């Protein structure tokens, strides 16, 4: 998948991918085409933008970097032979190698500033005529050759007084904007890697014995409500940290930290855990001359200014060392908080519940600009588009809309997926945490919906020992979750969950050790005043849940059958019946993973969700009557709030609007008329900050199935010994022909069967899908998955070829395994090896047959002799052949092709040896600026523009021919 908002013209790089392990490569190795990496942003007409990254120029000349607006240059720098220039004027030396690079564009003044390796280098007027900025661009012009690299961390911010998130990976002395004060030689401050195993970088202030030292950072004078935030790791002993907000070198607010308490003067404000990075936030209001103090997301107190002032203009962090000591600090942010606009999120109207019920919802916090591959991939699918638009969840106003919608529909808490940033040291920051720490905890209505912890124990850093868990994870959980008054409780029990606790068995050595770890966590939570801690996990109700010391199971989602109320009832009943631990009934809307390119599947109807929730309330919850564990009869979980890629989301969106939330409200809240409100376009502009509202890409929508002939190209039955002998079997404890079926059992984790070489190859072009008639049941599980593997190469290396399918454990059913555009091995040419997995792991199966379903007659596309597999077959229309422009296929890897889709115009822009614009429903194209008539208007088929193949070849400069079975395009390099 592509990373959101980036459009990469790689023709100058011969089509080589720009995504590298150490950053984004900007490469030009020919002078036939340009190279350009473009990152769109919402159009900015005022204010100051700051771009920060590590920039490496490796070779050549002609590399450029800058900002554009409306396709017009605003300001651009060009690298030539070791120097950066602007408008032909040499600015400063920039030796080949890696440098900290900060590019500041002041739109109001039309001025840019450059800050390189911590030193101010230049201030220049804008070099272009753009009256706004809506994209960042970097690359090489057509006639330039060279290589550069943008660092892994790449930040773009606007109108912050300070926005230092320690982006650079270049270790250095203190940058010029920071000042160290101390007795000569008694202290030093540097910027360095935090630990050898992490990519994080921090500032380190180290002072010798009996030394006072500090670092101060000045910024433009600011009045109003000025927010200052800093993360710091205090020394455990023999030193005290002092953090101050300043005005003209006078202290406005000062707090100290002795490694155990945060203090103001002699007054102890807050006791914190050791081995935890503290997040201190000071909101200094120059109107009231007071400051709101928050620590780790929690409001602690309000203090009067120490000295009256109309502004603040600096902060400092200082160290009083009795013995040699260090304080680490990072992520300093200063900005003026604007007042709430008149059209801010309306205050929630919380309905009265029908009973003593609590409803939680799983939350996936990946929707923060630049932290995922998400929004672009979501844009083609209108049913997945949330009513909040393509929002940034680190914005408190976004959180307030979410909170409003949840609490107005009976949802009590958000169970946030939490990903550890590292596991072998105190965490500077956790991964994908902007939603909770910058959004929810800073939201105006944050107390209306509680928070809870869903620890993702597998897909993030996880503790390698029980000691690491106790030392680094538990203190973090306490400080950033359980100490917060907004944390979710039921009758005094705190609620949390773990995703994949089985990972901890591997880390700690046994289920018993996991139990010991969780009991330690419980004891620490009880020490905060909770009655106890309920620990759920996302799992089926199996023996290991009890052995690990988990209290309950719930579903993160129910997979593809989550849309089916009867399937959900069966799953819940099975977990209740298993009885190893408690089952929290969970309701999902389905699992339509089309946006993540894993298939289109049904979604639940709101009426079915209402019925299913009523069943949970009326039939499942009453099963639990123990007064000592009252939470069991009160708690229902929903899956999930915002998994738009996985296709399981209750957030109001295109598919059913508020339908799912209204179903929740109707079941758990008293029937009082209400009105659902959503942000208008002007309000959305404040939420959709990093993803332009109207940006959209084109992808196969998978709404139209591949056509079938109703015929079978090749069929393998299991009725005779001859049928049996066509296959080799691996990992089965028993397999035989019985009653016209292949019947087998496995007690191993990965059994499979391989088609013998004598029955290969298979012509891939003549097969549209693989249909299997099978029943399979994995012991202790709900059905089982089947999957096919194949090879299309002479080495016969097998690849996972198809999406898995879920079997019915009780009946033989027909399941279709879709084959096609696998990235590693597309379904093409000759299938040289084939493997089928009739069951995943231990269990039994009955396999009736495997059918290779015949594809209809169609032409195959060949480019430079390579077969191009498309999501849909090419179409014959009026004697012409049209290809669907499938942007998930190898079409987009043609070395001399670049494309853009412009949603507002509904037009496809193609760049090859010629440039062309095709607009939906128009029978005229624009080629190199001239109007060219088309045989028929350009239309979209299953979301993909249809392009006449000879026209396409002409744009690329390829030779062209076709026959009854194929279309052949050849580049000049091959010719």
Predicted region positions:
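Short tryptophan-centered beta-strand motifs in secreted/extracellular beta-sheet-rich domains
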Residues: 53, 97-107, 112-114, 276-285, ...
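Extracellular carbohydrate recognition
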Residues: 143-162, 320-331, 828, 839-852
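Extracellular glycan-recognition surfaces and repeat-rich motifs
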Residues: 2-26, 172-202, 723-740
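Extracellular ligand-binding interfaces
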Residues: 59-88, 116, 236-268, 276, ...
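Glycan-processing catalytic domains of CAZymes
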Residues: 338-706
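Primary recognition of N-terminal secretory signal peptides and signal-anchoring hydrophobic helices
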Residues: 855-975
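Secretory/extracellular carbohydrate-interaction modules
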Residues: 22-84, 199-261
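Flexible glycan-contacting loops in extracellular carbohydrate-active proteins
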Residues: 124-155, 303-328
């Amino acid at each position: 998948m592509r990373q959101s908002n980036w459009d990469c013209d790689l023709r100058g790089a011969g089509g080589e991918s720009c995504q590298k392990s150490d950053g984004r490569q900007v490469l030009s190795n020919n002078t036939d085409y340009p190279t350009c990496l473009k990152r769109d942003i919402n159009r900015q007409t005022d204010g100051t933008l700051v771009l920060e990254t590590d920039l490496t120029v490796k070779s050549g000349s002609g590399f450029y970097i800058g900002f554009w607006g409306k396709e017009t240059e605003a300001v651009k720098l060009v690298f030539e032979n070791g120097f950066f220039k602007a408008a032909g004027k040499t600015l400063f030396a920039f030796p080949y190698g890696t440098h900290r690079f900060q590019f500041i564009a002041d739109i109001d003044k039309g001025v840019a500033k450059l800050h390189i390796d911590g030193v101010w280098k230049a201030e220049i007027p804008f070099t272009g005529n753009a009256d706004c900025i809506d994209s960042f661009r970097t690359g090489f012009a057509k006639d330039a050759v060279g290589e550069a690299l943008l660092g892994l961390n790449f930040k773009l911010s606007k109108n912050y007084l300070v926005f230092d998130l320690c982006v650079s990976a270049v270790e250095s002395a203190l940058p010029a904007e920071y000042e160290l004060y101390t007795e000569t030689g008694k202290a030093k401050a540097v910027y360095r890697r935090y630990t050898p195993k992490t990519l994080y970088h921090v500032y380190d202030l180290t002072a010798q014995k009996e030394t006072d030292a500090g670092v101060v950072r000045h910024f433009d004078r600011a009045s109003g409500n000025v927010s200052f935030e800093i993360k710091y790791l205090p020394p455990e002993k023999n030193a005290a940290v002092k953090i101050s907000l300043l005005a003209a070198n006078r202290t406005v607010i000062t707090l100290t930290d002795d490694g155990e308490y945060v203090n103001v003067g002699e007054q102890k404000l807050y006791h914190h855990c050791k081995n935890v990075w503290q997040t201190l936030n000071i909101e200094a209001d120059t109107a009231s001359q007071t400051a709101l103090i928050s620590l780790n997301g929690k409001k602690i107190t309000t203090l009067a200014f120490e000295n009256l002032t109309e502004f603040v203009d600096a902060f400092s962090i200082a160290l009083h060392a009795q013995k040699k000591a260090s304080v680490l600090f990072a992520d300093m942010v200063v900005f003026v908080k604007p007042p709430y606009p008149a059209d801010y999120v309306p205050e929630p109207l919380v309905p009265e519940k029908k009973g003593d019920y609590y409803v939680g919802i799983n939350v996936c916090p990946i929707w923060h600009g630049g932290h995922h591959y998400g929004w672009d991939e979501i844009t083609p699918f209108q049913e997945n588009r949330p009513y909040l638009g393509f929002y940034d969840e680190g914005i408190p106003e976004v959180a307030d809309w979410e909170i409003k919608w949840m609490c107005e529909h009976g949802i009590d808490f958000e169970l946030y997926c939490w990903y550890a940033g590292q596991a072998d040291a105190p965490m500077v920051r956790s991964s994908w945490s902007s939603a909770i720490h910058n959004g929810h905890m800073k939201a105006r209505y944050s107390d209306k919906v509680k928070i809870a912890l869903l620890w993702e124990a597998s897909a993030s850093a996880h503790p390698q020992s029980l000691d690491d868990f106790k030392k680094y994870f538990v203190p973090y959980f306490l400080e950033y979750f359980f100490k917060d008054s907004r944390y979710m409780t039921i009758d005094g029990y705190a609620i949390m969950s773990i995703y994949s606790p089985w990972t901890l068995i591997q880390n700690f050595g046994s289920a018993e050790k996991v139990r010991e770890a969780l009991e330690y966590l419980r004891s620490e939570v009880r020490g905060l005043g909770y009655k106890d801690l309920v620990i759920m996990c996302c799992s089926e109700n199996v023996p290991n849940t009890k052995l690990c010391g988990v209290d309950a199971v719930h579903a993160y989602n129910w997979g593809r059958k989550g849309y089916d109320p009867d399937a959900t009832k069966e799953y819940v009943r099975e977990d209740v019946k298993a009885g190893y631990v408690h089952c929290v009934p969970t309701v999902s809307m389905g699992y339509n993973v089309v946006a993540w390119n894993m298939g289109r599947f049904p979604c639940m109807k709101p009426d079915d969700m209402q019925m299913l929730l009523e069943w949970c309330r009326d039939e499942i919850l009453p099963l639990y009557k123990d007064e000592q564990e009252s939470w069991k009869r009160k708690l229902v979980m929903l899956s999930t709030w915002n998994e738009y890629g996985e296709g399981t989301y209750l957030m109001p969106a295109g598919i059913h609007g508020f339908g799912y939330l209204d179903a929740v409200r109707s079941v758990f809240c008293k029937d009082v008329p209400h009105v659902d409100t959503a942000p208008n376009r002007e309000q959305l502009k404040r939420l959709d900050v990093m993803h332009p509202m109207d940006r959209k890409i084109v992808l196969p929508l998978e709404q139209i199935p591949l056509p079938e002939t109703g015929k079978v190209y090749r069929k393998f039955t299991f009725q005779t010994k001859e049928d049996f002998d066509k296959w080799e079997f691996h990992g089965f404890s028993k397999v035989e022909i019985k009653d016209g079926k292949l019947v087998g059992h496995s007690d191993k984790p990965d059994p499979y069967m391989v088609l013998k070489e004598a029955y290969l190859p298979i012509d891939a072009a003549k097969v549209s899908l693989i249909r299997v008639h099978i029943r399979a049941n994995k012991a202790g599980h709900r059905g089982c998955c089947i999957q096919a593997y194949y090879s299309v190469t002479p080495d016969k290396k097998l690849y996972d070829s198809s999406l898995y399918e879920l079997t019915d454990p009780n009946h033989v059913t027909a399941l279709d395994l879709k084959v096609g555009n696998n990235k590693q091995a597309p379904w093409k040419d000759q299938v040289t090896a084939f493997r089928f997995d009739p069951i995943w792991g231990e269990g039994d199966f009955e396999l009736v047959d495997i059918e290779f379903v015949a594809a209809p007659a169609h032409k195959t596309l060949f480019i430079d002799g390579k077969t191009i597999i498309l999501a849909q077959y090419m179409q014959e229309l009026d004697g012409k052949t049209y290809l669907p422009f499938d942007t998930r296929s190898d079409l987009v890897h043609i070395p001399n092709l670049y494309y853009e889709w412009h949603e507002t115009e509904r037009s496809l822009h193609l760049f090859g040896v010629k440039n062309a614009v095709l607009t939906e429903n128009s029978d005229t194209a624009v080629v190199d600026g001239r109007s060219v008539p088309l045989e028929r208007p350009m239309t979209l088929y299953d979301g993909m523009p249809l392009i006449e193949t000879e026209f396409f070849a002409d744009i690329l400069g390829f030779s062209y021919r076709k026959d009854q079975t194929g279309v052949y395009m050849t580049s000049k390099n091959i010719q």
